[in-house]
Amino acid sequence: MEAIKKKMQMLKLDKENALDRAEQAEAEQKQAEERSKQLEDELAAMQKKLKGTEDELDKYSEALKDAQEKLELAEKKAADAEAEVASLNRRIQLVEEELDRAQERLATALQKLEEAEKAADESERGMKVIENRALKDEEKMELQEIQLKEAKHIAEEADRKYEEVARKLVIIEGDLERTEERAELAESKCSELEEELKNVTNNLKSLEAQAEKYSQKEDKYEEEIKILTDKLKEAETRAEFAERSVAKLEKTIDDLEDELYAQKLKYKAISEELDHALNDMTSI
């Protein structure tokens, strides 16, 4: 009887233990269900977050593509600007060479002009000498005319001195003829010198016109150089702006790459956490 009671107590104890284990199993099952539901909620949230991350990744990919296109466009603009600068440099060099040649021609023209001015001065001095000689000849002619008048007066007053006066008159007339010939020669020489002076003056005017033409051409070259210089400055500004744009785009790309790398790490961490959750669910 004692053995039966003892066995009953043991059975009762086993029953209580079984009930405790059943309650504990139910509690664990309930906890497992709650944990499973929590994991399912977390999984749904992670899937939603993962979808948002994928959308954001697509957006970043599109932004990266746009940035790359802008970078290529900026590189093309910078290359075009550099090519334009090189072309302008070549044009400026050609203009400078042409300007040097024009300055050389202008210097030659100025030298010829100076020589022509010297020749004109010499011609003017020669004309003054001729004028002085002609003036002296005229004075001499006037003196001879006075002498001729005196001789005629003496011939009228004294017939006895007729022969002597006639002889003197012949001499004076001969001198007068020679003087007239010299005067005519001086006048002819003066005409020649006037013609030469006229030619020198025309040459001088031609050289002055040519010098004025060179001066206008030089002003034109200076204006072209100024225009090319302004274009060069504009091209340099465009090139600098393109370089700044490229630097800005490179920084934007670097930032996007850093953010993309961070999102990849975040995605990897979420994937690992999701794998752990799935493993926990599988083990339960």
From Swiss-Prot:
<keyword id="KW-0009">Actin-binding</keyword>
<dbReference type="GO" id="GO:0006936">
    <property type="term" value="P:muscle contraction"/>
</dbReference>
<dbReference type="GO" id="GO:0007015">
    <property type="term" value="P:actin filament organization"/>
</dbReference>
<comment type="function">
    <text>Binds to actin filaments in muscle and non-muscle cells. Plays a central role, in association with the troponin complex, in the calcium dependent regulation of vertebrate striated muscle contraction. Smooth muscle contraction is regulated by interaction with caldesmon. In non-muscle cells is implicated in stabilizing cytoskeleton actin filaments.</text>
</comment>
<dbReference type="Pfam" id="PF00261">
    <property type="entry name" value="Tropomyosin"/>
</dbReference>
<dbReference type="InterPro" id="IPR000533">
    <property type="entry name" value="Tropomyosin"/>
</dbReference>
<feature type="modified residue" description="Phosphothreonine">
    <location>
        <position position="282"/>
    </location>
</feature>
<feature type="compositionally biased region" description="Basic and acidic residues">
    <location>
        <begin position="12"/>
        <end position="40"/>
    </location>
</feature>
<keyword id="KW-0175">Coiled coil</keyword>
<comment type="similarity">
    <text>Belongs to the tropomyosin family.</text>
</comment>
<feature type="modified residue" description="Phosphothreonine">
    <location>
        <position position="53"/>
    </location>
</feature>
<comment type="subunit">
    <text>Homodimer. Heterodimer of an alpha (TPM1, TPM3 or TPM4) and a beta (TPM2) chain. Interacts with TMOD1. Interacts with TNNT1.</text>
</comment>
<feature type="modified residue" description="Phosphotyrosine">
    <location>
        <position position="261"/>
    </location>
</feature>
<feature type="modified residue" description="Phosphoserine">
    <location>
        <position position="215"/>
    </location>
</feature>
<keyword id="KW-0597">Phosphoprotein</keyword>
<feature type="modified residue" description="Phosphoserine">
    <location>
        <position position="87"/>
    </location>
</feature>
<dbReference type="GO" id="GO:0005737">
    <property type="term" value="C:cytoplasm"/>
</dbReference>
<keyword id="KW-0514">Muscle protein</keyword>
<feature type="modified residue" description="Phosphoserine">
    <location>
        <position position="283"/>
    </location>
</feature>
<keyword id="KW-0007">Acetylation</keyword>
<feature type="modified residue" description="Phosphothreonine">
    <location>
        <position position="252"/>
    </location>
</feature>
<feature type="modified residue" description="Phosphothreonine">
    <location>
        <position position="108"/>
    </location>
</feature>
<feature type="modified residue" description="Phosphoserine">
    <location>
        <position position="271"/>
    </location>
</feature>
<dbReference type="GO" id="GO:0005884">
    <property type="term" value="C:actin filament"/>
</dbReference>
<feature type="region of interest" description="Disordered">
    <location>
        <begin position="1"/>
        <end position="43"/>
    </location>
</feature>
<feature type="coiled-coil region">
    <location>
        <begin position="1"/>
        <end position="284"/>
    </location>
</feature>
<protein>
    <recommendedName>
        <fullName>Tropomyosin alpha-3 chain</fullName>
    </recommendedName>
</protein>
<feature type="modified residue" description="N-acetylmethionine">
    <location>
        <position position="1"/>
    </location>
</feature>
<keyword id="KW-0963">Cytoplasm</keyword>
<feature type="modified residue" description="Phosphoserine">
    <location>
        <position position="206"/>
    </location>
</feature>
<keyword id="KW-0206">Cytoskeleton</keyword>
<dbReference type="GO" id="GO:0051015">
    <property type="term" value="F:actin filament binding"/>
</dbReference>
<feature type="modified residue" description="Phosphoserine">
    <location>
        <position position="61"/>
    </location>
</feature>
